[in-house]
Design a protein with these regions (language model features):
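Conserved catalytic alpha/beta cores of large enzymes that bind or transform nucleotide phosphates
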Residues: 312-412
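Charge-lined substrate channels and their catalytic hotspots, especially those that engage the 3′ end
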Residues: 1-286, 293-339, 370, 377-378, ...
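Phosphate-interacting basic helix/loop segments used at nucleotide- and nucleic-acid interfaces
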Residues: 184, 253-259, 264-282, 400-414, ...
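Intrinsically disordered, Lys/Arg-rich low-complexity segments
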Residues: 714-784
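Intrinsically disordered, low-complexity linker and terminal regions at domain boundaries
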Residues: 105, 125, 653-699, 711-718, ...
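Basic/aromatic-rich interaction segments and small domains that mediate binding to polyanionic partners
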Residues: 86-87, 100, 638-648
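A generic structural signal for residues embedded in beta-strands
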Residues: 109, 183, 635, 687-689
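Append "with occasional cross-activation on large, charged helical scaffolds in nucleic-acid assemblies
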Residues: 360, 373-644, 658, 662
Length: 784
C-alpha cells in the first residue's frame, strides 16, 4: 500500500485523505482505518507530510542534498549529537533539529553547517528521518494521573535523555501507584502527540522493595537475573563431581601443588596456578582454568543463554551471572581437595619473561589450598603466623612474586601502558542503602594473578594465530591521532615536554609522560585522560594486537564462567583437530559472537557506571551542607569537576562561583576576574556539598575559600578565554555534558572539616577498609 500511496502523491502532487482513500479503494470503514494507520506510520518515518490545509504531500529532499546515516546521542537538555560510522567527529544537532529522535535512534541527517577546525566548532546537522528506533521498552514507576483519562498514568523513568512523558494504557490489573513497570512503546512522539504511548509488559516490583532501584536500572537495559526454565533444568542435570570417564584422555595434574588466589568473598573460583623452578633456571607456570565448555555444549539451552548474556554483570549489591550458580559455584569452581576438569596453559618462562616452551591442553587438577589476596600479601610481607600456616606453598608464592616482577618489567620494556586508577567499592546494608565508600586494594597478590592471566591469554592467542586457524581475539587498536593530540595538549598544560607528533608518538613516550608525573596530585587525572584517548578494546575474528598491553597476540581464555569469548576459546581448544569442517564452522560463527560479546560488554559497563553514580549520589545525600577538601579533576567552560579521596566526583558550576571566571582553553584553567583565584587540574580546594540527586546520579558542590587557593593576578587573557559566571548558564552544546575524571588526593583531610553531630565521616580509614574486601565485584579487573 505504501508504494501505491507514493505513486498517487507523486502523480498528483497533493491529495486529501478522502481523495486518496477513494483512489485506493479504501473508503470502507475497516479499510479506511487501515489507511490511516499506514499514513501515520509513513508520516512518522518522514515519507509524507500533512500540509496546513490538511492535504498530503510527499516529503521530498532538496535537489543535490546529501544525506548521512548515523546514531543519535541525546542530551538531557534537548540537543544531541550524531555519530557516523568510521568518522571521528560527531555532528551537533540543535534542540529544534532533533525532530523527535531519541537516544540510540538510527537517523538520517543533512548538514546545516560544516565544521570549522580553526574555531573548534563541530559540524551542525538536522535530522530529517528516523530510520530505526532503538528504544522499545522503558522501566519506571507508574504515576497515576487523571489528566489524560484514556491512560492509567505516566512512567517516571531514570532515563534522563527521554524528555517527553510516557503515558501508559490502562492494563487489566489494578494499579496502586507503587508499581515499577516495564512497558513496551506502542507510539513515539510526533507532531500530532508530543508523548509516548506504552503498554504494560511486566510488573518489575514495587517502590518499597529492597534493591528495586538497582533492579530498575538492570531491567531498563534488559539485564535479567532469572534464567529460563530450560536453562535451569540443564544446569540441574550437571553432576556434582566429574566421573572417571570424564577424566579419560586428560593430563592428570592432581599431584601438582596448585592453589587458587581470590577475594575473601569469591565463590566462583575459576582459576588456579602452580609454579616450580626448573633445572635450567627457568620457571614453569601453570594456569588452570575451569573447563566450563565441557558442561556447556554448543547449541544447548545453557549455551544459547550464555551467548545471549555474553558476560556476567557486576553492580554494587549483586551479580547477574552469565551461567547459573549451579555451575559457577559448583562443579566449575576449583574448590580445594576435589577433582576438577580444567584447561591449562603450562608455560616455561625464562629470566627475561619470555615463554620458551608451552603446552595448552585439557587437564584434571585437585587444588591444595584456597588462598585469599590478603593471605598472600601477608605472606609476602613476612607475616610469620601466615607463613607457618601455609608453609607448604610459601616457596611457591615467593617464586610467583619473583616471576610477576619479571613479567611486569618485560611488559614495561616492550611499551605496555599502565592505566591504574582509583576504583571505589560501595558498601551497602541489608536494605541496599550505601553506608560507606572504600577504595579497592591492589597489592602484589592482585597484580600477580592478573599478570599470570595476561601471560596465559597471550600464549593461547599466539598459539592459534600461528596455526592460522579461525579464532577470536581481544584487540585494542592504535588510538586515533586526534585523540592523542588532545591528550598531548592536556599534558602540556602541566608543563610537560612532549616529544613526537600525535600520529607517531610511541608507547614508550607515553610511558615517560606518566612516569614524570608519578606522585603528583594530577597523576591519576592524567592517567584517566590517557585512557580516554585510547580506542575501546573489543573482540574480533581478526588479530590487530593489543596496543595497551603492547602485545602482538591477545585473547580471553581465563574466565569462561563470566565471559562467553573465553568459553568459545575453550571449545576451540577441544574441537580443533577433530575435523576440517569444524574450522569452517568456527569461521562462520566467530564474527557474530565477537560483535555480540563486545556489545554486551559495553552494556554491562554502562549498567555498572549508572548504578555506581546512583549509589554515590544516594550516599552523598546524607552529607549535603558539609565541607571537605577535594582535588580538581577536570575543568570545562561551564565549571570544574572535583573529586573527593573516596572517588566521589561533583560539579562546581560557574553559577556557584562567587565572581566572573575566565576559562582558558589552552591552559585548562578558570581564573577569577577580580580576585585572580585560579583553578587548575590537580589543585586541592575546599568544597561544600550543595546537592545530591539519586535519580540523576548528579552531585553539585560549591567553592569555599581556603588556604589552598592560588591567586594569579595581572595575567594576560588568552584568546581562547571562555565566558564566566552566568554567561554559560544556558548552553545548547557539548559544554553542558557532565564529564568524569579521576584523581587521587594523597593529602590527609583537614581537621577543620565540619561534621554533623554523631555522624561518621565518610572518608574515615578509606584505605584500611578497602583492604578487607578482596575481589569484590571483582573479577572485572581481568578484562584487558
Amino acid at each position: 500500500m505504501k508504494d501505491r500511496i507514493k505513486e498517487y502523491l507523486q502523480d498528483k502532487g497533493k491529495m486529501t485523505v478522502n481523495d486518496l482513500a477513494q483512489a485506493l479503494g479504501k473508503d470502507s470503514s475497516k479499510d479506511f482505518r487501515e489507511l490511516i494507520k499506514t499514513l501515520s506510520l509513513m508520516e512518522r518515518k518522514h515519507q509524507i507530510r500533512f500540509e496546513e490545509d490538511g492535504s498530503l504531500t510527499l516529503e521530498i529532499k532538496k535537489k543535490h542534498e546529501i544525506t548521512l546515516k548515523g546514531i543519535f546521542h541525546a542530551h538531557k537538555n534537548g540537543f544531541g549529537f550524531v555519530s557516523l560510522e568510521g568518522e571521528e567527529d560527531d555532528l551537533f544537532v540543535g534542540k529544534n533539529d532533533v525532530n523527535y529522535a531519541i537516544a540510540g535512534d538510527t537517523v538520517e541527517v543533512v548538514i546545516k553547517k560544516v565544521a570549522d577546525r580553526n574555531k573548534g566548532t563541530a559540524a551542525e546537522a538536522k535530522i530529517i528521518d528516523i530510520l530505526e528506533h532503538s528504544l522499545t521498552t522503558v522501566v519506571g514507576q507508574i504515576v497515576l494521573d487523571q489528566e489524560k483519562p484514556k491512560y492509567a498514568g505516566y512512567i517516571r523513568s531514570k532515563n534522563q535523555k527521554i524528555s517527553q512523558p510516557i503515558y501508559v494504557k490502562k492494563p487489566a490489573l489494578k494499579l496502586e501507584g507503587t508499581e515499577v513497570l516495564k512497558v513496551f512503546i506502542d507510539k513515539y512522539p510526533s507532531k500530532k502527540h508530543d508523548f509516548f504511548v506504552a503498554s504494560v509488559l511486566d510488573v518489575v516490583g514495587h517502590s518499597t522493595d529492597v534493591g528495586i532501584d538497582v533492579l530498575e536500572v538492570l531491567e531498563s537495559m534488559d539485564i535479567v537475573s532469572e534464567f529460563p526454565e530450560a536453562v535451569v533444568k540443564e544446569a540441574e542435570s550437571v553432576p556434582d563431581a566429574p566421573s572417571q570417564k570424564d577424566m579419560e584422555g586428560r593430563l592428570d595434574l592432581r599431584d601438582e601443588i596448585t592453589f587458587t588466589i581470590d577475594g575473601a568473598d569469591a565463590k566462583d573460583l575459576d582459576d588456579a596456578v602452580h609454579i616450580k623452578a626448573l633445572k635450567n633456571g627457568n620457571l614453569e607456570l601453570g594456569v588452570h582454568i575451569a573447563d566450563v565448555s565441557y558442561y556447556v555444549t554448543e547449541g544447548s539451552a545453557l549455551d544459547k543463554e550464555a551467548l545471549n548474556r555474553a558476560t556476567s554483570v557486576y553492580v554494587t549489591d549483586r551479580v547477574v551471572p552469565m551461567l547459573p550458580e549451579r555451575l559457577s559455584n559448583g562443579i566449575c569452581s576449583l574448590n580445594p581437595q576435589v577433582d576438577r576438569l580444567t584447561q591449562s596453559a603450562i608455560m616455561e618462562i625464562d629470566k627475561h619473561g619470555r615463554v620458551v616452551n608451552y603446552t595448552i591442553t585439557q587437564t584434571v587438577i585437585k587444588t591444595s589450598f584456597r588462598m585469599t589476596y590478603s593471605d598472600v600479601n601477608d605472606i609476602l610481607a613476612g607475616d610469620e603466623e601466615k607463613r607457618k600456616e601455609y608453609h607448604k606453598i610459601v616457596l611457591s608464592i615467593e617464586l610467583m612474586a619473583k616471576l610477576h616482577e619479571t613479567l611486569e618489567n618485560m611488559r614495561v620494556k616492550r611499551g605496555a601502558l599502565n592505566f591504574d586508577t582509583n576504583e571505589a567499592k560501595i558498601l551497602v546494608d541489608k536494605q541496599g542503602k550505601p553506608v560507606d565508600i572504600v577504595l579497592r586494594q591492589r597489592g602484589i597478590a592482585e597484580r600477580m594473578i592478573e599478570s599470570f592471566m595476561l601471560m596465559a591469554n597471550e600464549t593461547v592467542a599466539e598459539h592459534f594465530s600461528k596455526l592460522d586457524l579461525p579464532f577470536i581475539y581481544r584487540i585494542h587498536e592504535e588510538p586515533k591521532a586526534e585523540k592523542v593530540q588532545k591528550f598531548i595538549d592536556y599534558a602540556s598544560s602541566f608543563g610537560l615536554r612532549i616529544y613526537g607528533t600525535a600520529s607517531e608518538i610511541s608507547q614508550e613516550a607515553l610511558q615517560d609522560i606518566m612516569r614524570a608525573v608519578e606522585g603528583e596530585p594530577y597523576a591519576d587525572v592524567l592517567s584517566m585522560m590517557l585512557l580516554r584517548s585510547m580506542q575501546q578494546a573489543r573482540y574480533s575474528e581478526h588479530n590487530h594486537g593489543h596496543y595497551g598491553l603492547a602485545a602482538d597476540y591477545y585473547t580471553h581464555f581465563t574466565s569462561p564462567i563470566r565471559r562467553y569469548p573465553d568459553l568459545l576459546v575453550h571449545r576451540m581448544i577441544r574441537d580443533y583437530g577433530c575435523s576440517k569442517e569444524i574450522a569452517e564452522h568456527f569461521e562462520q560463527v566467530i564474527p557474530e559472537i565477537a560483535t555480540q560479546s563486545s556489545n554486551r560488554e559495553r552494556r554491562a559497563i554502562e549498567a555498572e557506571r549508572e548504578v555506581e553514580a546512583m549509589k554515590k549520589a544516594e550516599y552523598m545525600e546524607e552529607y549535603v551542607g558539609e565541607e571537605y577538601d577535594a582535588v580538581v579533576s577536570s575543568i570545562v567552560k561551564f565549571g570544574l569537576f572535583v573529586e573527593l579521596p573516596n572517588t566521589v566526583e561533583g560539579l562546581i558550576h560557574i553559577t556557584n562561583l562567587p565572581e566572573f571566571y575566565h576559562f582558558n582553553e589552552r591552559d585548562l584553567t578558570l581564573r577569577g576576574e577580580k580576585s585572580g583565584i585560579t583553578f587548575r587540574v590537580g589543585q586541592q580546594i575546599r568544597i561544600r556539598v550543595e546537592r545530591a540527586d539519586k535519580m540523576t546520579g548528579e552531585i553539585d558542590f560549591s567553592f569555599v575559600p581556603s588556604e589552598f587557593d592560588v591567586i594569579e593576578k595581572g595575567l594576560k587573557q588568552s584568546s581562547h578565554s571562555g565566558r564566566g559566571r552566568g554567561s554559560n548558564r544556558r548552553s545548547d552544546k557539548k559544554e553542558d555534558k557532565r564529564k568524569s575524571g579521576r584523581s587521587n588526593d594523597k593529602r590527609k583531610y583537614s581537621q577543620k572539616d565540619k561534621k554533623k553531630k554523631g555522624k561518621k565521616p565518610f572518608y574515615k580509614e578509606v584505605a584500611k577498609k578497602g583492604a578487607k574486601h578482596g575481589k569484590g565485584r571483582g573479577k572485572g579487573r581481568r578484562t584487558k
